[in-house]
Design a protein with these regions (language model features):
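"…together with the soluble PPM/PP2C metallo-phosphatase catalytic core" -> "…together
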Residues: 2-285
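Cytosolic, membrane-interface loops and tails of multi-pass inner-membrane proteins
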Residues: 39-65, 291-322
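Solvent-exposed interhelical
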Residues: 181-195, 305-313, 317-328
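Alpha-helix N-cap/helix-start motif at coil-to-helix transitions, marked by capping-box chemistry
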Residues: 231, 286, 306-310
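Hydrophobic alpha-helix feature that most strongly marks membrane-spanning transmembrane helices
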Residues: 242-246, 259, 267, 271, ...
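Final/C-terminal transmembrane alpha-helix of multipass membrane proteins
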Residues: 325-346
Length: 350
């Protein structure tokens, strides 16, 4: 909305041009989302969110019992309200915003249910949401992607792009959800991912000269999705103020599923599947490897990582005696190293 107001009034009053700046709108989205979440989340979570019932087999699950959970149903609508103000809206962006809310609502219904929903029900819902998002992004046309170590691009037919996109978004949703078991962990790792994606989408993929210099594609809507990424990073900053150890509330499935969904979508919008490792490698290893272990054992009777407990944060807490702050700091340091190292390789070795 603000973008279009700026477009209409910039000739009448020069300072209104500021509202047409994606950089300004990204900063405004970050600050507004962060402030609203920091200011109002505890009040609404205490009043409207259910109490955590603990996770079966999770390490130190008893410490979370009784705290407000499902806080995502509070901060995701705040995030969406800000997006309606700061984004140069398109039908695609509106669709992504709507699906983010859908993911949050279904997660919240599971959070507040007296009996946890079955894995297959939640998996099927995630699959439908992932399919809708992939079709919304790529349509039924061939999609061009770019790969590491080559300046050439690859065309994927919809018969290949749609299944791969669905699998990626579904994995992002569930890996992020599995990581939400340590105070501040999923929020910190995800906020790092969104900041990196925001920088890539705005400064590189959404910038004509920079994308040409680095021999990567230029996307006209890259800066728009950069605003979205920075706004979610701000939202998570406000949430982490209250989720820092020892936490006073938790995002629950209402937050982690919506957050994972948006993370998956933004990686697709970047056009390079390997960015998933760059921005969210620790999230994928921590939560996604456990999904792989369970799937192989359940459907193919193949056992892997027999001596490792998943999610990996439970393994290091129980078997390595890491404290919660140690898990958070060490996982974050590994992700920082992965992001900086792999990003240089991805962008410069072409």
């Amino acid at each position: 909305m603000l973008y279009w107001i700026g477009m209409m009034l910039e000739n009448s009053w020069g300072p209104m041009r500021l509202l047409t700046s994606h950089f300004f709108l990204g900063g405004l989205g970050f600050v507004a989302c962060g402030y609203l979440t920091w200011r109002f989340l505890p009040r609404f979570a205490e009043k409207y969110c259910p109490r955590d019932r603990g996770r079966a087999h999770a390490v130190e699950a008893n410490k979370a019992q009784g705290k407000p959970t499902g806080a995502g149903i509070v901060f995701i609508p705040m995030f969406i309200a800000v997006q309606l103000l700061v984004l140069p809206l398109s039908w695609e962006a509106l669709g992504i915003i709507a699906l983010t809310l859908v993911a949050s609502v279904f997660g919240f219904l599971d959070d507040k249910s007296s009996d946890a929903w079955g894995e297959y029900i939640k998996g099927a819902i995630d699959l439908v949401i992932a399919l809708a998002a992939t079709v919304l992004i790529g349509g039924f046309d061939s999609v061009e992607i770019w790969l590491p170590f080559t300046k050439h691009q690859l065309m994927l037919s919809p018969l290949l792009y749609i299944p791969l996109g669905v699998v990626w978004i579904w994995t992002a949703i569930n890996a992020t959800n599995c990581t939400d078991g340590v105070d501040g962990l999923s929020g910190t790792l995800a906020s790092m991912a969104f900041l990196t994606l925001g920088a890539l989408l705005y400064f590189v993929l959404g910038h004509v000269e920079m994308s040409s210099y680095l021999l990567v594609p230029h996307y006209n809507d890259g800066a728009t999705y950069g605003i979205m990424a920075l706004s979610m990073a701000g939202t998570l900053a406000g949430y982490l103020w209250h989720n820092a150890h020892p936490s006073s509330l938790m995002m629950g499935d209402a937050g982690s599923r919506a957050m994972g969904f948006l993370l998956g979508v933004l990686v697709l919008k970047c056009g390079n599947p390997f960015l998933s490792l760059v921005v969210a490698g620790v999230l994928l290893v921590n939560g996604g490897t456990g999904l792989l272990k369970v799937a192989l054992l359940r459907f193919f009777k193949i056992a892997i990582f027999r001596d490792i407990r998943f999610p990996l944060h439970d393994h290091v807490r129980k078997n390595k005696n890491w404290s919660t702050p140690q898990v958070l700091v060490r996982f974050s340091l590994v992700q920082m190293a992965m992001t900086l190292g792999l990003l240089v390789l991805l962008l410069k070795f072409r």
